[in-house]
Amino acid sequence: MRKSAAPKRPVVKDPVYDSELVTQLVNKILLDGKKSTAERIVYGALEICREKTGLEPVGTLEKALGNVRPDLEVRSRRVGGATYQVPVEVRPARATTLALRWLVTFTRQRRENTMVERLANEIMDAANGLGASVKRREDTHKMAEANRAFAHYRW
């Protein structure tokens, strides 16, 4: 094991919206090192959000992530011979990472024609409290609530 925790590397703000969240989203969309393609997808999706909602796209993205960020999750903990699903609070950085991961995962599973449309619609759905990524958060919270009896095994 390493002696101390690895230092968090600073996230560079993206040039268009001056937002760390947009940079993180671009990096999550990224496949095979094609960053310009990932940027085109994200910026296109945010533009569609601006046209359809008439609001600032970064605000819409933040609202969407706020609706997708989990507060609790379950982690496996072995006690004796049994493995318990122990509910734990999610640290803010991990909550954001999970929210972005779920957003991108469920964007890829959508049925619209282009990735730009899929991402835009998933962001707008999440901002309105709909969509598969919000459902994933609710399921995660339900799991934590169901296993509340094991909360005293927290570490």
Curated annotation (Swiss-Prot):
InterPro entries: Ribosomal_uS7, Ribosomal_uS7_bac/org-type, Ribosomal_uS7_CS, Ribosomal_uS7_dom, Ribosomal_uS7_dom_sf. The keyword NAD does not apply. It comes from the Bacteria. One of its GO terms (biological process) is translation. GO terms for molecular function: rRNA binding; structural constituent of ribosome; tRNA binding. Gene3D superfamilies: Ribosomal protein S7 domain. It holds the Pfam family Ribosomal_S7. One of its GO terms (cellular component) is small ribosomal subunit. The keyword Ribonucleoprotein applies. Belongs to the universal ribosomal protein uS7 family. One of the primary rRNA binding proteins, it binds directly to 16S rRNA where it nucleates assembly of the head domain of the 30S subunit. Is located at the subunit interface close to the decoding center, probably blocks exit of the E-site tRNA. Part of the 30S ribosomal subunit. Contacts proteins S9 and S11. This is Small ribosomal subunit protein uS7. It comes from Corynebacterium efficiens (strain DSM 44549 / YS-314 / AJ 12310 / JCM 11189 / NBRC 100395). The gene is rpsG.
